[in-house]
């Protein structure tokens, strides 16, 4: 009887150690791109105060456009609340360009297709929960 409990204890301990170190991933796919010039910027945020402008709380990538679809997988993420901001950096200058009046001159989209009034959407509108793995497909509108 003691031996059986010993094995149950060891199996339970081993299982909990495996789950403790487990991380999640987010696969982001941008579809129906309307041009092959420039690059796609994808920002992944977990901090409401920095969304979508600051580098704090952001993991970002720039992807070369080779086709009408690009994708990236963010790995080794802790479970939690995240939001995504994407823009088409057509001139590859690393910035989200705006007109003299402040209107965007490059295509953009946010997770949940969230929209803001006279600016970006709130983190709450664009956010989603990451528990294991998430697949997000977005298209510029």
For each feature predicted by the language model, list its residue ranges:
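Beta-strand signatures of extracellular beta-sandwich domains
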Residues: 41-45, 85
